[in-house]
Amino acid sequence: MFEYLNGKLVKISPTNIVIDLSGIGYLISVANPYAWSALMNTEVKIYVHQVIREDAHSLYGFVNESEKALFLRLISVSGIGPKSALAIIAAADNEGLINAIDNSDIKYLTKFPGVGKKTAMQMVLDLAGKFDATGAVGISLLDAAPASNLALEEAIEALQALGYKATELKKIEKKLAQEAGLTSEEYIKSALKLMMK
């Protein structure tokens, strides 16, 4: 099983993206493929879940571990397969979905593609109360950026190793993420400038 892949985003289609990793193109189904557009031809980190069936080996991709955890919770519900779970993630704001499940809001849940009344009731039965205070196994809507920027992640880790606090770095991370295409060293320089202000 794979936990995540680090590779170059080389193709985007209506339902999938392709990550080139050491000359092999991995076709990965994702909730919102075009949300990855800004990262085309850059190194990305994508969390994955592999589904092996007799007729296919499929990879499903997620922007972070929390989105993956939500997906795994959804596919544990009878009547929800991987494609339906991706459609729900694509159509939902995760907080609203979690609130609807915890509050047994069947009407809200049946608005999702492929979710009828019976499946919505099963979602409530199987998942109500299974989410922590921050959401689906720790979902943070702030972390749900289109994809991880490998160079930025390396820069943040390097700054933490130098003794900068995670809270300080969180404050400037969004500003840094807007500066796409920089190397780790350039991100570090930019971060230091922002923290000096």
Swiss-Prot record:
Organism annotation: Lactococcus lactis subsp. cremoris (strain MG1363)
UniProt entry tagged with the keyword Disulfide bond: no
Subcellular location: Cytoplasm
SUPFAM superfamilies: DNA helicase RuvA subunit, C-terminal domain, Nucleic acid-binding proteins, RuvA domain 2-like
Family, per entry: Belongs to the RuvA family.
Chain segments carrying region Flexible linker: 142-146
Stored InterPro entries: DNA_helicase_Holl-junc_RuvA_I, Hlx-hairpin-Hlx_DNA-bd_motif, NA-bd_OB-fold, RuvA, RuvA_2-like, RuvA_C, RuvA_C_sf
Sequence segments annotated as region (Domain III): 147-197
Protein name as annotated: Holliday junction branch migration complex subunit RuvA
SMART domains: HhH1
Keywords, comma-separated and alphabetical: Cytoplasm, DNA damage, DNA recombination, DNA repair, DNA-binding
Superkingdom of the source species: Bacteria
Region (Domain II): 64-142
